[in-house]
Regions:
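Charged/polar, solvent-exposed surface patches and flexible loops
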Residues: 8, 12, 16, 55, ...
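Generic hydrophobic, helix-prone segments enriched in Leu/Val/Ile
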Residues: 10, 100-104, 242, 433-443
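Conserved, well-structured beta-alpha core segment at the onset of a catalytic domain
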Residues: 25-34, 43-46, 242-257, 512
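Alpha-helix capping and helix-coil boundary motifs
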Residues: 2, 184-186, 243, 303-304, ...
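Terminal-proximal interaction/regulatory segments of ATP-powered molecular machines
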Residues: 300-512
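AAA+ P-loop NTPase catalytic core and its hallmark functional loops
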Residues: 1-212, 217-220
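Alpha-helical lid/collar subdomain of P-loop NTPases
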Residues: 196-355, 359
Length: 512
């Protein structure tokens, strides 16, 4: 199965294992809660999926790469204790709590979450001395003499033997106690994630042209050459930062992430062209509705991959504006909800307390900050959600400063001042939405003039549809031409599907 299907199955499993009956007991007893065993090539996204599942289910996550541990850290350290058995004093060996089990309790204490996921990576690559401990863990859900706490779902991951020489096969007794999921790389599924994760547009357009280069692991006399989903994502983060700093990524740098010489060389050449197209075609001018006439003349002679790269650049420019609009929306919505609570709280502030409104507002901000830090520590905030909360805090602190400088005479005056501050924020949101909408209209103007209803327009509309950020913007704000082309695209798709069905029917009955 692909990683998206695996994520859905794990999410459903967590909900099922943590469901309780009318008496407050787990509906599925712990002994029947089979650990999940994910088997798949390295760098496919197993660890990230666990982070997403934990965040979306609102539970804690403790993740370990077991190859980093010894038997002592997994089982605990031995110590001698005096016991009396049958009237005879004896010395017996006991063990301290496993470091892994202790980490679960520490996570529970730090986050306030009593339920979670224990994720053990590379479980079938452990040393010979640790192998029996891992078998005991999967079969009995214990490390040494310490059981995994109730309410914690066990997920383990490993690599097939063709990807790791250290792999140890599990026996049938162990496999009969786990739920095994075999995961394979899947570019279309990864693209859904990549759009939401803001993977660099050059990488997405390159893989659109060369899908076979998404994931490869090849072994020859020179060693293992590979490229993984993790490599592309990590490279994307670096490219974004390099662009911000005005630095240039060369082939040597790309090889550090894409450890497949031919693919690294090919992508490096493509990246150079990508930046060249961005400058030559003037993408920002296109999105401002000021495309140069020479651009259209050049496109008439341009090969398909160059035209597709330009479409990708236009989509990337739109994506930046859509993201800014969405972020402005999220910040404004959060601040509005905050002000509603502020209005309620102000009603409880006595009018005769100096700076009472400002002090109350300050305490609200402190509470929001504390909540943010707690959720951050628990891993319950996505990158976008954390960014929104940090921006909200910055806005609220600015409002607090205005409130203190104004020295409002009463609670109503204080709230009127805050409401005025919010109106400025709402104006900024409206401006971001208008900027994005204007750029989208300019993009359609250019696409119609340059490509009409060709394959490039199909790609453009399709990418607007599948990208979650652009799709959310279009759903919220609309665009007449997008809906027109999208409708035509759906009709063409249905006609093509119907034609295929008719052709298949004719072959069956006509002997063609």
């Amino acid at each position: 199965m692909n990683i998206k299907r695996a994520k859905e199955e794990i999410e459903h499993t967590v909900k099922a294992y943590l469901a309780k009956d009318a008496l407050g007991e787990y509906a599925i007893p712990a002994i029947r809660q089979r650990p999940i065993l994910l088997m798949g090539p390295p760098g496919i996204g197993k660890t990230q999926v666990m982070e997403q599942v934990a965040r979306e289910c609102g539970v804690a996550l403790v993740a370990y790469t077991i190859t980093h541990h010894t038997r002592q850290s997994a089982v605990g350290l031995p110590f001698i204790r005096q016991r009396n058995y049958g009237g005879k004093d004896v010395s017996v060996t006991e063990y301290t709590m496993s470091e892994i089990i202790a980490s679960i309790y520490a996570k529970m204490e730090a986050t306030g979450l009593s339920e979670g996921i224990l994720f053990i990576d590379e479980i079938n690559c452990v040393s010979e001395t640790l192998a029996p401990t891992m078998l005991q863990f999967l079969q009995c859900k214990t490390f040494g003499n310490q059981a995994v706490p109730a309410g914690w779902v066990i997920v383990a991951a490993g690599n097939p033997p063709e990807y790791n020489k250290s792999v140890r096969d599990f026996d049938i007794v162990t496999l009969d106690r786990v739920r095994r999921m075999d995961i394979e790389p899947d570019l279309p599924v990864w693209k859904d994630y990549a759009c939401a994760a803001h993977i660099h547009s050059a990488i997405l357009s390159y893989l659109e042209l060369h899908p076979q280069n998404f994931y490869q692991i090849n072994a020859d006399v020179d060693g293992t050459q590979f490229v993984t989903a993790r490599g592309w994502e990590d490279l994307s983060n670096l490219l974004d930062t390099y662009e911000t700093l005005g630095l240039q990524a060369d082939e040597d740098l790309i090889r550090e992430y894409i450890q497949h010489p031919k693919i690294a060389e090919d992508f490096s050449a493509y990246l150079d062209l990508y930046y060249k197209y961005r400058d030559d075609y003037g993408v920002e001018e296109i999105l401002a509705g000021q495309a140069k006439p020479a651009v259209f003349a050049r496109l008439l002679q341009a090969p398909f991959d160059e035209r597709l790269s330009l479409v990708s650049l236009i989509l990337a420019g739109l994506g930046t504006r859509f993201t800014a609009s969405r972020q402005a929306d999220a910040v404004a919505d959060s601040c509005y909800a905050f002000l509603r609570e502020t209005k309620k709280a102000l009603a409880t502030v006595p009018e005769d307390i100096p700076d009472g409104s400002a002090e109350m507002f300050h305490q609200q901000i402190m509470d929001y900050d504390t909540e943010t830090q707690q959720k951050r520590a628990a891993g319950l905030l996505s990158k976008d959600a954390l960014t929104t909360r940090l921006q909200v805090l910055a806005v609220l602190r600015g409002w607090e400063g205005e409130l203190r400088r104004a020295n409002a005479a009463g609670t109503q005056e204080a709230f009127d001042l805050l409401r005025g501050q919010f109106q400025s924020l709402a104006d900024e949101r409206e401006k971001a939405q208008q900027t994005a909408s204007a750029a989208l209209e300019a993009a359609f103007d250019f696409m119609e003039q340059a490509f009409a209803e060709s394959q490039e327009m199909v790609v453009f509309v399709t990418e607007l549809t599948v990208d979650p950020v652009s799709h959310a913007f279009l759903t919220e704000n609309g665009c007449e031409r997008y809906f027109k082309y999208n409708k035509d695209l759906l009709l063409d798709h249905r006609k093509a599907a119907l034609q295929q069905e008719l052709s298949a029917e004719q072959r069956r009955h006509g002997g063609v």
